[in-house]
């Protein structure tokens, strides 16, 4: 072995190998930078690397066989009297070491500065799919291909599809439109700021099907991308739509395409056309509030495809909206069992809906929507869902951030901008709320909620007359606007202490709500009426109104003020029942309210310190405006004026949360009425 090493050294093999490795290393690193700059094909760099690898053993062999002399290159084994060029020596060692060092430094520099392979952050692309032109005459394709195409293109992280049913509804409001054809889709896209319209067609030729789709600029109609595929028979049509979606994604610049995952046939069974068509009809009916009718079509879809996960989740939502909670819970279990039949995007959306609407597990819902946003940053439903969940956890800054991301994708989204205005209102940023609400009214003058921030800003500024004017404008828009406005007008009167004026407004509003079937609105007004009756000393009338409200709705927004009135009426057991129901829920805000009621019962019994401890524990669960307000009152009752002043000051600073204290966009500014008095008492207790 030692002899071999000596011979390798004598023949300069080690030095030649080091020199070769250093030069090849530098060449490859340089090529990895220069070739992409000149749009060279990927195979050029691969060929260079392969050549370098293949060349290494060849160089070693040549170094063993040949030597460089003053007469040129000679075979080392030949006898010669020529003088060998001084290729060796310490000087050459330094040269080889230097080249290797340069190669190493260059490589480290390239890795540090370039980082991991960067994924190009593409701008979000919103897409509205127009009705396919069905030239086959087969109605089975109507409303089916559009849904399949949307599922396929939404697998691209930067693409989000605009709801077709919402688009059709908007198109109908803009003109005499009954179908979402290319012209109607372009009109809606321009109005809503949607970046692309996809218009497709399907035709049949001797049992084979040809599908063609164009991606259009909605303003000028320029074709930005197109794709065409064929299907051998009807059963292959949905799979062909998946291939079509893949081609369009590639043309739009999607580098994450995995055609095996994209194939629509993985999401639908062989009976998918029938299932997909029934599902599309169910979705449209559900969107338009026809829940009973949607149930039949969801079940039809499930009969055609028993593993149709999205149909189960849609059915569960409709059943829940109809109050059929037991059926809804059972259906949700089936939806969760069939998550595997969904695309990753649909799976995360479904989990977000389940956590937010069924279990009310806000933290898990936020996790699902955050995962959805991370993987599909253009998903408008993800940003909207994330914003709403942050809102319900009282993180208004995070809600504004997520809501702002939604508006970056859909700047023309009326609902998105209205929500953004309301988040600002709850955060107490009334100027921003009013400015955004004005933009909402510019987009859609019939959006009645855009007047709520205006009314609340006026009340916060002490201008009750301006608040009434805002409610008058709201009432003139629609029936729901009139319902909210009547509660708002009564709320203003109660804030001013004019309970006598509030009662007839509430009574008339209740009658209108009951006539229109608006149970929640009627229940909320009954609770407000009960508060007015209690304030004027008519406890019996107040309890009667309270019980009527609870019969219509027993959500937190009704139960919590009901419990407060039960305590006032001395019916502590009924208050405890409500508290027990609230603390047994998963949602932290509900449990915090339950603990607040328990604390107020303790306070009523003279247990001031225990009540304060209970209120503090409630705040640790959820920092709610109403809990902080009552902790201030408890502190003051117990003689802790400084602590009470801190609580009341915090409530004054968080006026936005009192605008609709139960986060349902229904006015409760009346709860601010006696806050200045309580703050004054606390300050008086400190001699201020």
Which residues make up each language-model segment?
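Catalytic-center loop of serine/cysteine hydrolases
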Residues: 94-101, 105-120, 148, 152, ...
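Active/binding-pocket-proximal capping segment
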Residues: 581, 617-621, 629-657
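Structured segments of extracytoplasmic/periplasmic soluble domains
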Residues: 135, 148-159, 188-191, 247-255, ...
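Extended non-membrane alpha-helical scaffolds
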Residues: 276-300, 305-624, 640, 672-675
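Acidic, Ser/Thr-rich low-complexity linear motifs
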Residues: 265, 654-673
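Glycine- and acidic-residue-enriched helix-capping/strand-helix junction motifs
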Residues: 138-146
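An N-terminal, helix-rich hydrophobic module
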Residues: 1-107, 192, 219-222
């Amino acid at each position: 072995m030692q002899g071999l090493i000596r011979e390798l050294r004598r023949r300069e093999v080690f030095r030649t190998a080091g020199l070769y490795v250093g030069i090849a290393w530098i060449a490859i690193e340089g090529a990895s930078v220069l070739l992409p700059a000149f749009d060279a094909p990927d195979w050029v760099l691969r060929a260079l690397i392969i050549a370098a690898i293949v060349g290494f053993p060849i160089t070693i062999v040549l170094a063993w066989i040949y030597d460089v002399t003053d007469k040129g290159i000679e075979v080392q084994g030949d006898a010669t009297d020529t003088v060998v060029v001084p290729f060796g020596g310490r000087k050459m060692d330094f040269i080889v070491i230097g080249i290797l060092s340069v190669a190493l430094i260059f490589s480290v520099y390239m890795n540090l500065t370039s980082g991991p392979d960067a994924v190009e952050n593409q701008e979000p692309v919103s897409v509205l799919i127009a009705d396919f032109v069905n030239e086959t005459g087969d109605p089975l394709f109507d409303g089916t291909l559009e849904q399949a195409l949307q599922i396929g293109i939404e697998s691209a992280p930067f693409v989000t599809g605009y709801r077709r049913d919402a688009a059709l509804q908007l198109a109908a409001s803009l003109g005499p439109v009954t179908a979402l054809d290319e012209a109607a889709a372009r009109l809606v896209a321009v109005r809503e700021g949607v970046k692309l319209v996809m218009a497709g067609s399907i035709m049949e030729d001797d049992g084979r099907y040809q599908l063609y789709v164009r991606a259009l600029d909605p303003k000028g109609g320029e074709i930005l991308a197109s794709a065409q595929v064929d299907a051998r028979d009807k059963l292959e049509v949905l799979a062909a739509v998946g291939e079509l979606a893949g081609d369009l994604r590639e043309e739009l610049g999607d580098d994450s395409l995995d055609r095996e995952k994209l194939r629509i046939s993985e999401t639908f069974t062989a009976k998918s056309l029938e299932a997909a068509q029934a599902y599309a009809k169910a979705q449209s009916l559900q969107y338009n509030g026809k829940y009973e009718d949607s149930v039949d079509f969801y079940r039809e879809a499930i009969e055609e495809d028993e593993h149709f996960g999205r149909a189960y989740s849609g059915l569960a939502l409709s059943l829940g909206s109809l109050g059929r909670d037991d059926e809804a819970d059972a259906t949700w279990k089936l939806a969760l069992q069939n998550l595997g039949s969904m695309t990753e995007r649909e799976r995360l959306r479904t989990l977000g809906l389940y956590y937010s609407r069924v279990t009310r597990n806000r933290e898990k819902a936020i996790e699902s929507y955050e995962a959805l946003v991370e993987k599909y940053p253009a998903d408008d439903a993800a940003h909207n869902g994330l914003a709403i969940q942050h809102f319900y956890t009282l993180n208004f800054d995070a809600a504004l951030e997520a809501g702002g991301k939604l508006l970056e994708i859909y700047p023309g989204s009326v609902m998105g901008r209205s929500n953004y205005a309301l988040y600002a209102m709850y955060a107490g940023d009334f100027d921003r709320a009013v400015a955004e609400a004005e933009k909402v009214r510019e987009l859609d003058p019939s959006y009645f909620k855009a007047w709520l921030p205006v009314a609340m800003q006026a009340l916060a500024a002490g201008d009750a007359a301006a608040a009434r004017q805002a409610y008058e404008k709201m009432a003139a828009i629609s029936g729901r606007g009139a319902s909210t406005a009547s509660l708002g007008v009564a709320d203003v009167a109660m804030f001013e202490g004019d309970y006598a004026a509030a009662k007839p407004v509430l009574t008339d509003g209740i009658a209108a709500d009951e006539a229109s079937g608006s149970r929640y609105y009627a229940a909320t007004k009954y609770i407000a009426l009960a508060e007015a009756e209690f304030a004027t000393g008519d406890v019996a009338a107040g309890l009667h109104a309270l019980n009527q409200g609870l019969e219509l709705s027993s959500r937190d927004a009704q139960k919590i003020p009901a419990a407060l009135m039960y305590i006032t009426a001395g019916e502590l057991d009924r208050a405890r029942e409500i508290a027990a129901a609230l603390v047994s829920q998963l949602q932290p805000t509900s449990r915090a309210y339950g603990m607040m009621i328990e604390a107020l019962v303790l306070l009523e019994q003279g247990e001031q310190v225990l009540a304060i401890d209970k209120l503090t524990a409630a705040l640790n669960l959820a920092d709610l405006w109403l809990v902080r307000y009552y902790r201030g009152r408890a502190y003051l009752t117990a003689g802790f004026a400084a602590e009470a002043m801190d609580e009341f000051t915090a409530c004054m600073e968080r006026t936005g949360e009192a605008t609709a204290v139960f986060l349902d966009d229904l006015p409760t500014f009346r709860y601010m009425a006696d806050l200045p008095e309580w703050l004054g008492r606390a300050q008086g207790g400190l001699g201020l």
